[in-house]
Amino acid sequence: MDGSEDDPTIFSARCLPSDPRLWATVTNSYLGTRVYHDTIHINGVYNGAVGDTHRASLPSPLNVQLEAPAGTEQLTETFTLDTNTGSFLHTLEGPSFRASQRIYAHRVLPHVLVFSVSIARLTTGNKPITVPLRADFSPESPDLDLRVGPDFQGLRYLHGHVLNPEQPGEPQQEVHMLWMPVPPALTLGEEEKDRTWEFLTVVGSSQAEAQDCFAEALQLQTRGVLYTIHADSWGRLWAGCGLDVAGPLALRQALRGSLYYLFSELPQPGTQGFISHGLSPGGLSNGSKEECYWGHIFWDQDIWMFPNILMFHPEAARAILEYRVRTLGGALKNGQNLGYQGAKFAWESASTGLEVCPEDIYGTQEIHINGAVALAFQLYYYYTQDSKLFQEDGGWDVVSSVAEFWCSRVEWSSQDKMYHLKGVMPPDEYHSGVNNSVYTNVLVQNSLHFAAALAKDLGLPIRKQWLEVADRIKIPFDSEQNFHPEFDGYERGEEVKQADVVLLGYPVPFPLTPDIRRKNLETYEAVTSPQGPAMTWSMFAVGWMELRDPSRAQVHLSRSFANVTEPFKVWTENADGSGAVNFLTGMGGFLQAALFGCTGFRITEAGVTFDPLCPDLVSRVSVSGISYLGNKINFAFSKDSVTLEVTARAEPWAPLLEAELWPSLAHLPLTPGQKVSFPHSAGRIQRSSP
């Protein structure tokens, strides 16, 4: 091999997994595919009416594999996902030659997918070397009315539109694809030592867009820098942010792989005019007809993925929130269809924000998604102080519409003088139609308090009912057993599907005494299904880290590895391999266990608090490139000390920062370019004191 066995950034194997679902994905902010798969997906392009809405499948010209030259013996074959360059490499090596295929979704040119083939002569002979290519392409799609158009500058041309839009009367989205035809074989000539061929696929929403994007790619290809610019872009991304530990290689690889797959879905930092269509559980590479929910937007985006993105890339986080702003009209319609005021964000949404979940019960009852959406806006506001999003760009409309829905949805109980929320399904989907889900009701309270505080900041009137409901909504609590029942009538010992009550405290801000936090963790740890989704154990790990129990935290971190498949670190939704694959939701929860659990980071109105802890098997944690209030910050700690450094003021308006340490209340200036180290301590990163 090449030493990649010990490299946490490169994942290699001698053969591909027997299950093609677990093959690596290559994705950018516009296009996504799985290597050697017959389908490409385009961000925001769905086919099928409500209940059947799924990502439209475009046939993939990248579905090409190298084959061994005739008569080759002693062949070595490797398959590698290189997260450093965001590319997948297949290499065939014999005694006299090396042939390699590289596949990538171009990071700088998001409308472009590329595969290249390189052949190198390893001996002094001069015989031609011919490498066969096995291509499997048919210009057909079950989701698109496609037609073959005239060639364009030697490229094939396919164009058409989706068959059935999400809503009747909507325009049928157009798709235009140009690609370079692939020969049956490539030959290195007698006098050549090495050669590389590049094959481009370009996709756009119009013929003109596809042709313009091809012209841009061709210009880079002519200069010989098409791949270099892509790889350099990934290099800059990794140089600007990261999350690593001194610990087991498997943990380091899981962290790096999760960052790679999540960041693959985002635009390059600084990209202008990016329009987000949301982040789905299976990412852009998944979501075809038989896997429709993998491509829909759930709470997964707002609770599980968003906090990681916000910490490193606030501009991408803003674009994700803008998806919720753009689909607010659909959310308002959902609320109206249920008979309530305000916005009810869809349990599963696609282009319009209208409910596309094929089963009514989830759209009707899993209303906790509203609280997840509001929480994402709240965290963004605290972390960036970007009031423009709320004053001018629709953020206030989302927050206030969620508040209106909650006030319309609750019922007043004259018996116990509290507001109740009846007939809901909590995150624990084993229970439906319950009253007063504690998780949901805490989110209601949080959403309403934030709406009132935001109104005050923006100089807007505060609805009295918001605070009345927030202060008087029922939060179930058993004072005798000192824990929070999941809902009214929950009996201890009942099995639950996944993390639910244990989300109180983190990621949902809610004050808990250590005793109650511990009792919640112990109660639900004993009854959570081992078949539950991947992010569950990460949240138990966060809880135990809050309580300074590194051994129990490590147990739950380790449980997450049942969902990580080899060799390409593709996550599955469930430990038995079922459910969504390339499961970004599980990756997001796992990343939060390190990024928020180990560090103790909590985003608050006053600053970013920290309370670091190394789990068992980890001696050091390093976080680089978090972006707080326009400042780039590195944060690292061991069991004995903490080091902080503001590496740059990325925005001209960025304020000076300081670290306030607890319990001493010492204030340490964070001067850009100067590292500040101190004995292991909790504290807060905040604006410098006047």
UniProtKB/Swiss-Prot annotation:
Top EC class of this enzyme: hydrolase
Keywords from the UniProt entry: Glycosidase, Hydrolase
GO biological process: carbohydrate metabolic process
Gene3D superfamilies xrefs: 1.50.10.10
UniProt key word Hydrolase: yes
GO CC annotation terms, alphabetical: cytosol
Protein EC: 3.2.1.107
Matches recorded under Pfam families: Glyco_hydro_65m
Record's catalysed reaction(s): (5R)-5-O-[alpha-D-glucosyl-(1->2)-beta-D-galactosyl]-5-hydroxy-L-lysyl-[collagen] + H2O = (5R)-5-O-(beta-D-galactosyl)-5-hydroxy-L-lysyl-[collagen] + D-glucose
Any one GO MF annotation of this record: protein-glucosylgalactosylhydroxylysine glucosidase activity
Active site: E429
Known function: Catalyzes the hydrolysis of glucose from the disaccharide unit linked to hydroxylysine residues of collagen and collagen-like proteins.
Family: Belongs to the glycosyl hydrolase 65 family.
PANTHER family (alphabetical): GLYCOSYL HYDROLASE-RELATED (PTHR11051), PROTEIN-GLUCOSYLGALACTOSYLHYDROXYLYSINE GLUCOSIDASE (PTHR11051:SF8)
UniProt protein name: Protein-glucosylgalactosylhydroxylysine glucosidase
